[in-house]
């Protein structure tokens, strides 16, 4: 997931509610939604119910090379686990497939500076998802450092670029794909994006969304490697890059499960099931599917009248591919049938901030969902922040289809402020999830109480929409 600016709201300690109570916020135009609404919870979801699902996904990763990446055996085993759980609960389950480009970086990649150190893939850099292979030597030309907010996102950042050199850029405000396309157009033979905040062993692997048009190596580098390349640019040293990647095609599955309720419209809840190339993906995003499975269990046992659809997406880490394929395949009637889509991605960050999606320009009804979730969490002792997640997770295509959307999130690489540490505990000055997209994203680091609290909030808003207490367009 990408990092976004957060809007602060005071908070307090976390609790798990037995009664789900919520009220819409003062901006709600619906008088009935602005009145206090009390929903009798069929049962509270506890962290002890969440943990077995996380352990099952961790075991799947361990049995499959430490990964659950879409297009791998680890991901398909995750699909089988989720589908079996839902069938045992009595849901109608489908596993529709979609085709996607797969990606793998082969071991042994290096970046060397003439007369200087050699840096290795994994520890010092990673080839971004859909990077091309390459074995080349060239000088370095820095771009975008005069305006770090742009960071190569604008074609004008490459004015005066020396064709045939390696482009070195800071992290900008756009998707990395745009920077790569600008670099290719300017004649770069490779692109290295330097992340000053990443130390040795910590580089992440952003996605370039598609291999189309990407014919140069594209690397995500630590601050140390970035500094070495800056020095090489200043003294004119040659830099050698050797990296090998494999790009293929695979049929990958989503999991779609629906209850047998009789309402005309369906409430849809989802979260991505795939992990990254560099770890087991337990908080990101085993936590969302684990919460969804327990919500599904409660609804199946206690509220069989509710018409609810659950989605477990593949290919999110490559660029929201599974959810995009699903929404693209919906006819107009199928889109109109969905009363709301609720997204759950990264619910248990250890240095968390509780966050409610609140996106300007989202479909009518989205603000009511956000107000409801905020009011629910406040009622159980958590005052969440609101965030515009943009295109950072699987709600994006539902938002684009003008379906009301909402969701919950607990933070990724965003740095916790002093005010947030005062409000929620944890450590100021550190990432909300220091193991985001790394091998250390394991069960032991997940905040189970937070996942459970979020699951109860999701259950509350689902029942409110399904039962008509929260009216949406």
What do the PLM-derived regions correspond to, one by one?
Residues 124-153, 210-282, 294-297, 301, ...:
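Soluble metallo-hydrolase cores and metallopeptidase-like ectodomains found primarily
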Residues 35-73, 98, 108, 274, ...:
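N-terminal capping segment at the start of a domain
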Residues 262-264, 277, 303, 313-417, ...:
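Metal-dependent peptidase/peptidase-like ectodomains
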Residues 211-213, 296-321, 344, 471:
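Short helix-loop-beta-strand segments that form the rim/entrance of peptidase-like active sites
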Residues 52-55, 59-163:
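Noncatalytic luminal/extracellular "stalk/propeptide" segments of secretory-pathway proteins
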């Amino acid at each position: 997931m990408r990092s976004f600016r957060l809007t602060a709201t005071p908070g307090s300690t976390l609790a798990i509610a037995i009664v789900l109570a919520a009220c819409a916020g003062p901006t709600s135009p619906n008088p009935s939604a602005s009145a206090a609404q009390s929903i009798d919870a069929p049962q509270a979801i506890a962290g002890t119910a969440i943990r077995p699902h996380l352990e099952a996904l961790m075991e799947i990763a361990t049995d499959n090379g430490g990964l659950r990446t879409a297009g791998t055996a680890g991901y398909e085993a995750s699909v089988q686990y989720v589908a079996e759980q839902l069938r045992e609960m009595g849901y109608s389950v489908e596993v529709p497939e979609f085709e996607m480009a797969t990606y793998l970086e082969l071991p042994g990649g290096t970046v060397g500076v003439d007369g200087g150190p050699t840096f290795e893939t994994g520890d010092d850099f990673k080839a971004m998802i859909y990077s091309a292979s390459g074995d080349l030597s060239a000088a370095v030309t820095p771009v975008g450092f005069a305006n770090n907010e742009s960071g190569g996102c604008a074609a004008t950042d490459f004015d005066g670029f020396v064709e045939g050199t390696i482009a070195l850029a800071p992290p900008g405000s756009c998707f990395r794909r745009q920077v790569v396309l600008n670099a290719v157009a300017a004649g770069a033979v490779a692109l290295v994006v330097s992340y000053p905040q990443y130390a040795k062993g910590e580089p992440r692997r952003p996605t370039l969304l598609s291999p189309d048009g990407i014919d140069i190596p594209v690397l995500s580098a630590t601050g140390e490697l970035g500094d070495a390349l800056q020095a090489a640019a200043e003294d004119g040293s040659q830099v050698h890059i050797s990296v090998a990647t494999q790009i293929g095609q695979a049929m990958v599955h989503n999991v779609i499960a629906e209850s047998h309720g009789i309402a005309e419209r369906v409430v849809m809840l989802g979260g991505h099931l795939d992990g990254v190339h560099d770890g087991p993906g337990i908080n990101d995003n085993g936590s969302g599917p684990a919460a969804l499975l327990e919500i599904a269990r409660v609804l199946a046992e206690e509220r069989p009248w509710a018409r609810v659809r659950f989605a477990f997406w593949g290919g999110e880490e490559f660029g929201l591919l599974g959810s995009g394929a699903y929404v693209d395949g919906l006819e107009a009637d199928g889109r109109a049938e969905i009363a709301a889509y609720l997204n759950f991605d990264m619910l248990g960050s250890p240095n968390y901030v509780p966050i409610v999606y609140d996106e300007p320009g989202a479909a009518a009804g989205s603000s009511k969902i956000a107000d409801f979730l905020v009011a629910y969490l406040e009622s159980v002792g958590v005052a969440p922040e609101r965030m515009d997640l943009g295109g950072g997770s699987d709600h994006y295509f539902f938002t684009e289809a003008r379906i009301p959307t909402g969701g919950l999130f607990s933070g990724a690489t965003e740095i916790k402020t002093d005010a947030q540490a005062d409000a929620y505990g944890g450590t100021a000055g550190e990432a909300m999830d220091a193991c985001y997209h790394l091998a250390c994203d394991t069960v032991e680091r997940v905040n189970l109480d937070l996942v459970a609290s979020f699951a109860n909030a999701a259950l509350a808003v689902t029942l409110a929409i399904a039962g008509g207490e929260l009216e949406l367009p």
